[in-house]
Amino acid sequence: MCIRDSPDLLLILVPRHPERFKDAREMVQKGGFSFTLRSSGEIPSGSTQVVIGDTMGELMLLYGIADLAFVGGSLVERGGHNPLEPAAHAIPVLMGPHTFNFKDICAKLQQADGLITVTDADSVVKEVSTLLTDEDYRLWYGRHAVEVLHQNQGALTRLLQLLQPYLPQRSH
């Protein structure tokens, strides 16, 4: 499955750092894709193939309209980005094998069928194709991803409760 072959697909490409916005735009232009910039405020048309998220602070909004998410920085040895952000929207999370920045949560997501590990462009295409054509498969992974998030909420409160006997009492 490819954007060129599937006119109803829309890729939302969000560079992690603002200095990469220009590179993303040039890459999309060079590929010959029809695109809009999020910063333009333009609503994507039926012929838009890519939306470049070139604004700050809107990643969670963009995950909220997605059917699945590939979390970058993980196919190369950068360590990946936060998989809990897409998991919060109950969408399948795909990441490469380099997840050392979020090792523990990625392990939990993997064990719970909330994370799909891909190794290269071909495996990304294969998994995305399966997720987009098999709704049950897509919903399964999304449901398990958000369950991991719910199971791990409140960690700070639990930690503070455990530490309470050892913390000095504050006088009011």
What are these regions (language model features)?
Residues 1:
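Phosphate/diphosphate ligand-binding glycine-rich loop within oxidoreductases
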Residues 4-172:
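Nucleotide-activated sugar donor-binding and catalytic core shared by glycosyltransferases
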